[in-house]
A protein has these predicted regions:
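Ubiquitin-like/PB1-type beta-grasp interaction modules and other compact soluble beta-rich domains
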Residues: 1-111
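Amphipathic, non-transmembrane alpha-helical segments in extracytoplasmic/periplasmic proteins
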Residues: 24-31, 153-154, 213-214, 279
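GST-like fold's C-terminal all-alpha helical module
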Residues: 249, 255-257
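Feature responds to low-complexity, polar/acidic, surface-exposed segments characteristic
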Residues: 6, 78-84, 88, 97, ...
């Protein structure tokens, strides 16, 4: 789809039979050529400078002010790379849009003062924020280095599933009836996404380890009928022996899917707590794959 801030230029168009590795730019070029549009592209900085419609109407950067110009997003997410570098997958939806002020476009920036544009997880955090799956600990703080709790991930996965009605009984002695995470934890337990401990507790406020995160996410993937058969060989990691037996399959799957990767060249850190930034990165990768 191609549109300006006031008009639809190219209605949603299906492009099929594309080879693996096709970029947004390839599809952009094809559709514009097919529809009789031309464009100007900045090769060095990899962005669209101007587009001209078949009737001669030309819209370029700065045509409507210093913050105006062409943007693109895929699946409603603004990209942090140029069109040439964004590789598409089946079902991706491309939107090329002209904005009079990019600062006013939802999803172009984050409201958090502790996540700058050069933070390693900025793009992932922004994706989770714009999708409503992760928010800050308050209006201006995301707390990227804060540990995730077990309840937090249950809430995110519950939100990802549309927050269906919960009718099952509460199986845990330490999950109160009226907490912010109650429905999410009960739903996750009912659907085999979480399990508790031998003493009947869930321990919702405990830090979520990376191994536990892998198990929950793998179970969620199975629940949504995603393929969970992939397995990676983890023997090269020096701490592979620290992976609990109950988490081995899930860790192998998560690593094969590039969801949970090494914290450094040699360590998976399976027993370490998962930070909020790491969880944003893991979930962002899962959604993209």
């Amino acid at each position: 789809r191609l549109h300006t801030d006031t008009d639809e230029w190219i209605a949603p168009t299906v492009v099929s039979d594309l080879p693996e590795g096709t970029s947004v730019f390839t599809v952009f070029q094809k559709v514009l050529a097919d529809k009789g549009y031309t464009y100007e592209y900045h090769e060095q900085y990899c962005y669209v400078q101007a587009i001209t419609a078949p009737d001669g109407t030309r819209l370029a950067e700065f045509s409507k002010g210093q913050n105006s110009g062409w943007l693109f997003r895929v699946n409603n997410d603004f990209a942090d790379v140029g069109m040439n570098d964004f590789v598409l997958m089946d079902g991706d939806e491309i939107e090329v849009l002209y904005t009079a002020d990019y600062e006013k476009e939802p999803g172009m920036s984050l409201p958090y003062t502790d996540v700058s544009w050069d933070h390693w997880a900025y793009t992932a955090i922004k994706r989770m924020y714009t999708r409503g799956l992760m928010v800050g600990v308050n209006e201006t703080t995301f707390a990227p280095s804060q540990e995730m709790s077990r309840a937090m991930l249950a809430v995110i996965l519950y939100a990802r599933s549309g927050q269906p009605a919960v009718e099952a009984a509460n199986p845990f002695t330490d999950v109160p009836a009226d907490s912010w995470y109650t429905d999410a934890v009960i739903w996750a337990a009912e659907n085999g996404i979480v399990s508790g401990f031998g003493d009947g507790t869930f321990r919702p406020n405990d830090a979520l380890t990376r191994a536990q995160a892998a198990v929950m996410l793998c179970a969620f993937a199975a629940f949504t009928q995603d393929d969970v058969t992939a397995r990676a060989d983890l023997s090269a990691y020096s701490d592979a022996g620290q992976i609990p037996s109950w988490a081995m399959d899930a860790m192998q799957w998560a690593n094969a899917r590039q969801l949970i990767i090494a914290r450094d060249s040699a360590h998976l850190a399976p027993t370490a707590a998962t930070t909020r930034a790491e969880m944003a990165s893991i979930l962002s990768a899962y959604i993209r794959k």
